[in-house]
């Protein structure tokens, strides 16, 4: 039985800078919080427990990265350079680039190689305070390769101190072998891939890219119905490049989240509010593709729709691994406030995964998953650009990352 009191810390237990405790303590037993509050109020029963003094550092819940494509083969830096030189995305795609190049690299990689590439990205996220993450498939686009991606995601969760939730995104793009046969491919997604992967226990949720360059409303609904048959929650890449009406469909199916949302309208916002669907904003992708259409943050505020922030870590449109950087981008590009972005990477991000009861806040009975920050103010988490701020990451009461480890 391991018992520890983490003391002399500034505590932000709910991801809300308005609700903090100065000179706080957290009592942890067997990986779970049994008490938290001001040091001066520490109950006598914990007084003799071993102490870890954090020297007045800020402590927040472990960060939650709720939308990533972390597992993939290769990278697309050369295409990035081509775009900067004036080559269009369409021209790159005709040359065999774009998402097809990532599909090709992912299909070619064996599990060990895919694991090694993805582990490096996960290690970078852990070092910046992440204790829970969602990882999507969607760069395999056939049963064997989608299975491989999801198996690697599961292995990452088993071998690293980060909780991994998997999402099947077979309906991400049309693979070359199904060119001009989108309906046939959706048949394969719904009747071939999803049943097999769900039966193997590799899928926690199902996603679809509903967009003019992705899949139609009717095709997206077929994927959602297939997910329902397997008892799996759904989410959607929606309204990123146009207002295709995907958000209303996602809300009708009680989606955990709708993500991107640059072209979301008020009707879609109202539908999300009624359904309890979280808005996941992805400032890295907005920045990287030089989008100019801002997501309707003010409408989301007005309707009280929870807003999460995520890296969208992927090789094509957001090669990012830093949630604090996304916090900065969300404040500067999307005009969000510090409290909004802090909630966006903690409690609201957990809600976007359907895991608000286990992640994103610190409370008695919860796992002791938290990040320790070398800052004077929580605003610094969104203020500094490229500066390492996370001193320590604790998962289940154990230190799993220490920036100045000796």
From Swiss-Prot:
Q: Which GO terms describe its molecular function?
A: imidazolonepropionase activity; iron ion binding; zinc ion binding
Give the InterPro entries listed for this entry.
Amidohydro-rel, HutI, Metal-dep_hydrolase_composite, Metal_Hydrolase
Task: Name its cellular compartments.
Answer: Cytoplasm
Pathway connected to this protein: Amino-acid degradation; L-histidine degradation into L-glutamate; N-formimidoyl-L-glutamate from L-histidine: step 3/3
Lineage of the species this protein comes from: Bacteria, Pseudomonadati, Pseudomonadota, Betaproteobacteria, Burkholderiales
Q: Where does Fe(3+) bind?
A: 67, 69, 237, 312
The record's remark on the cofactor is: Binds 1 zinc or iron ion per subunit.
What organism does the record attribute this protein to? Paraburkholderia phymatum (strain DSM 17167 / CIP 108236 / LMG 21445 / STM815)
GO annotations under biological process?
L-histidine catabolic process to glutamate and formamide; L-histidine catabolic process to glutamate and formate
The identity of this protein, by name, is Imidazolonepropionase
Q: Which cofactor does it need?
A: Zn(2+); Fe(3+)
Give the Pfam families listed for this entry: Amidohydro_1
Asked if the record carries the keyword Aminoacyl-tRNA synthetase, the reply is: no
The entry marks the following residues as binding 4-imidazolone-5-propanoate, namely: 76, 139, 172, 240, 317
Summarize the protein's role: Catalyzes the hydrolytic cleavage of the carbon-nitrogen bond in imidazolone-5-propanoate to yield N-formimidoyl-L-glutamate. It is the third step in the universal histidine degradation pathway.
Q: What positions does the entry give for Zn(2+) binding?
A: 67, 69, 237, 312
Q: Which domain of life is it from?
A: Bacteria
Q: Which reaction(s) are listed as its catalytic activity?
A: 4-imidazolone-5-propanoate + H2O = N-formimidoyl-L-glutamate
- Residue positions binding N-formimidoyl-L-glutamate: 139, 314, 316
